[in-house]
Every structure is written in structure tokens, then in C-alpha cells.
A protein has these predicted regions:
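Soluble extracytoplasmic domains of inner/organellar membrane proteins
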Residues: 108, 115-116, 123-147, 151
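A transmembrane-helix-recognition feature enriched in membrane-embedded lipid enzymes
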Residues: 1-43, 90-95
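Generic beta-sheet signal
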Residues: 79, 100, 128, 160-163
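A cross-family acyltransferase "interaction/gating" segment
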Residues: 87-89, 137-190
């Protein structure tokens, strides 16, 4: 609870006053703190992580966002409905989330221009091209339009494979947030 409150205060009071570089460091530090509190350890190979990459990841859980931000702070593309979620929508809107109205090609073009602009400025942008969460054991069809901004900006696409593992080396499905699993159930399972 204290960590969530600190995230709200950070977003409300401190981030608006910071330089872009400081904002990204704070986002990363807060994500690391959250993952530490949840007992999540991140392993990442950043050998191909150039400035301004489009991170293309599978989507298992709500914590995927913090896993990515802990390693490579990024702007995210999310479905427009997220903006209307209590507290979380407000946080997302103030933490570099670009909201996409699904099913609107016109809006997709606008979002793609915004993403290409960020990539052109050297910012990382993350997308979950499956458009939903899964248990992480397989991939769904990718919505290819989400890859267009990297092509438009001449920036690389960095594939990100997110999976969760127990300390004993067994794959963990605890973080999954798919099907009939509620946010509360997912959080308790982690």
C-alpha cells in the first residue's frame, strides 16, 4: 500500500518537474521497487537494446509493464478503455501511455504517428501486439499495424519474450491475468 501511494505521489508531484532523463530513471527505480516488493526478479539480455526501439512483447500480466520499465523505461500503447479505469487509468495517462481506440483505422494512424515521433526522439515504446493477455505458453496473432511506427521511423523492433519462473526452475502461471482471473486473484497469486 505504501509503495502504491508513493507511486501516486511520484506521478502527481515529482514527475512533472523532472527532466525527461530523470523521469525515465524514476520510472525505472519505482518499477524495480514494486517488483522487489512482489518478489519478482528480472533477467534481461539488452545486447540489442538501441535508443528508440519498438519493444514488441507478449502480454501475460499487469506486471509486464513494470518488468519492461525496470529494464528499459518505455512509453506504452494501451487500449483506450484503460484510460477510464479508476486510479490505474490516471496513472497510465500520466506515465507516457498512448491510448488506442480499437477498431478505428483513423485513430490507429494517429497513434502510429505519435509512436514514430517518440521513436524518432530516441524513446523506447512498448506494444503488446497480441492485443490481450495470455498465460504465456503460446503466442496469439499479432496486430501488425502496431509494428508500422518502427518502419516509419526507421527504428529497430526489439522482440521481448516475457515468462515467469519459480525459484526451482518450473514455469509459473501465477502472474497470468487472463481468462476469468481477476486483478485481485492475480495479485494474490504473485
Amino acid at each position: 500500500t505504501l509503495l502504491v501511494l508513493s507511486g501516486l505521489l511520484l506521478t502527481l508531484c515529482l514527475l512533472p518537474l523532472c527532466s525527461e532523463a530523470a523521469r525515465l530513471r524514476l520510472k525505472s527505480s519505482w518499477a524495480v521497487a514494486l517488483l522487489d516488493a512482489l518478489g519478482v526478479e528480472v533477467e534481461a539480455d539488452l545486447a540489442h537494446a538501441l535508443p528508440g526501439v519498438l519493444l514488441v512483447a507478449n502480454h501475460v500480466s499487469w506486471i509486464d509493464i513494470y518488468v519492461i520499465n525496470a529494464v528499459m523505461p518505455a512509453a506504452f500503447v494501451a487500449k483506450a478503455e484503460v484510460r477510464d479505469w479508476p486510479v490505474l487509468g490516471w496513472l497510465a495517462a500520466r506515465n507516457d501511455t498512448i491510448f488506442l481506440r480499437r477498431g478505428s483505422r483513423g485513430h490507429a494512424h494517429i497513434v502510429n504517428r505519435q509512436v514514430a515521433e517518440l521513436l524518432g526522439k530516441g524513446r523506447h515504446v512498448a506494444v503488446f501486439p497480441e492485443g490481450t493477455t495470455t498465460d504465456g505458453r503460446s503466442l496469439l496473432y499479432f496486430h501488425a499495424a502496431l509494428l508500422q511506427p518502427a518502419l516509419s521511423a526507421g527504428k529497430p523492433v526489439l522482440p521481448v519474450a516475457i515468462s515467469y519462473w519459480e525459484a526451482d526452475g518450473q514455469r509459473s502461471l501465477a502472474p497470468r491475468y487472463d481468462g476469468d482471473i481477476s486483478l485481485g486473484q492475480c495479485t494474490r497469486a504473485i
